Curated annotation (Swiss-Prot):
Tissue expression from the record: Seed.
Residue positions binding Mn(2+): E8, D10, D19, H24, S34
Family designation: Belongs to the leguminous lectin family.
Source organism of this protein record: Cratylia argentea
Function comment: D-mannose/D-glucose-binding lectin. Has anti-inflammatory activity in rats. Induces histamine release in mast cells from rat. Induces lymphocyte proliferation and IFNG production.
Subunit structure: Equilibrium between homodimer and homotetramer. Oligomerization is pH-dependent with homotetramers forming at pH 6.5 and above.
Keyword Translocase: no
Additional observations: Binds one manganese (or another transition metal) ion and one calcium ion. The metal ions are essential for the saccharide-binding and cell-agglutinating activities.
InterPro entries: ConA-like_dom_sf (IPR013320), Lectin_LegA_CS (IPR000985), Lectin_legB_Mn/Ca_BS (IPR019825), Legume_lectin_dom (IPR001220), Leguminous_Lectin (IPR050258)
UniProt protein name: Lectin alpha chain
PTM summary: The beta and gamma chains are produced by partial proteolytic processing of the lectin alpha chain by an asparaginyl endopeptidase. Mixture of 60% alpha lectin and 40% of its beta and gamma proteolytic fragments.
Length: 236
């Protein structure tokens, strides 16, 4: 199975798999059952911003999600990623819909990692920024229903004539692997930011967007749609 660390923006509470009974952001370590959550209210049709950071000295993964003029939701969890992730990983975005649906539109995405190694004076770093997405992106690995549209947006799940479709799952991963730790036990610090737009034609919306780090050959697990956000094969 894939090894996944994720931050979920969960728009539909699935209390049967440990979700709180409200919309929330959560930090997930190798399971859809979040290690830490905080209440979050999605604003239908508005552009929000998510910022994720990992401090390798404090060993703390944090996320903050906000809308312009609104309050922010913040969640953090203390975790030593070099005990969990392989040395090389890919970073990605994932989303799903189930019976209920929403658009899972990404307008921009950036990432910076810095791995300071003991063996050399210099730091290994990776940085990318998408302020828009090209029609046939060579620097993204698109999986499932993910696509880029003529407006320069990344649609993680299926949209037809501007309307979200049910039972859809899609992911986008940056093509270049990231070196997150090395054998001298030095772990990379990183920052990621993405802007997103979730909108729905229904009163009920589902299921959410996740930012994730995974082994480099990660693919969408069979049966991981809906509440599993395209990340995990089951709810364990």
């Amino acid at each position: 199975a894939d090894t996944i660390v994720a931050v979920e923006l969960d728009t539909y509470p699935n209390t049967d798999i440990g979700d709180p009974n409200y919309q929330h952001i959560g930090i997930n370590i190798k399971s859809i059952r979040s290690k830490a959550t905080t209440r979050w209210n999605v604003q239908d049709g508005k552009v929000g911003t998510a910022h994720i950071s990992y401090n390798s000295v404090a060993k703390r993964l944090s996320a903050i999600v906000s809308y312009p003029g609104g309050s922010s939701a913040t969640v953090s969890y203390d975790v030593d990623l070099n005990n969990i992730l392989p040395e090389w990983v890919r970073v990605g975005l994932s989303a799903s819909t189930g019976l209920y649906k929403e658009t899972n539109t990404i307008l921009s995405w950036s990432f910076t990692s810095k791995l300071k190694t003991n063996s050399t004076a210099d730091a290994q770093s990776l940085h990318f920024t998408f302020n828009q997405f090209s029609q046939n992106p060579k620097d993204l690995i698109l999986q499932g229903d993910a696509s880029t549209d003529s407006d320069g947006n990344l649609q993680l799940t299926r949209v037809s004539n501007g309307s979200p479709q049910s039972n859809s799952v899609g992911r986008a991963l940056y093509y270049a692997p990231v070196h997150v730790w090395d054998k001298s036990a030095v772990v990379a610090s990183f920052d990621a930011t993405f802007t997103f737009l979730i909108k729905s034609t229904d009163s009920d919306i589902a299921d959410g967007i996740a930012w994730f780090i995974a082994n480099t050959d990660s693919s969408i697990p069979h049966g991981s749609g809906g509440r599993l956000l395209g990340l995990f094969p089951d709810a364990n």
